[in-house]
Amino acid sequence: MPKIKTLRSAAKRFKKTASGKFKRKQANLRHILTKKTTTKKRHLRPKILVSKGDISKVKSFLPYF
């Protein structure tokens, strides 16, 4: 069997935590930021965990992580 390739775009977007969960950056913080309040932008800043329904898909993208 050949080795499974890692999806490089996913490798740049997701990081695995010590407990085996995946962290990701939140959306809506790239452009058109002048309309958004400072509070909204501050709440979007921290990384959040990938939802339970998407974990299996992320794991298939990152077989060696």
Swiss-Prot record:
Signal peptide start and end residues: none
Keyword Ribonucleoprotein: yes
Pfam families: Ribosomal_L35p
GO cellular component, one term: cytosolic large ribosomal subunit
GO BP field: translation
Alphabetic keyword roster: Ribonucleoprotein, Ribosomal protein
Disordered: region residues: 1-22
Ranges of compositional bias, category Basic residues: 10-22
Key word Transferase present: no
Membrane-spanning intervals of the chain: none
Annotated InterPro entries: Ribosomal_bL35, Ribosomal_bL35-like, Ribosomal_bL35_CS, Ribosomal_bL35_sf
Superkingdom, natural source: Bacteria
Family: Belongs to the bacterial ribosomal protein bL35 family.
Name this protein carries in UniProt: Large ribosomal subunit protein bL35
Gene source species: Buchnera aphidicola subsp. Schizaphis graminum (strain Sg)
GN (gene name): rpmI
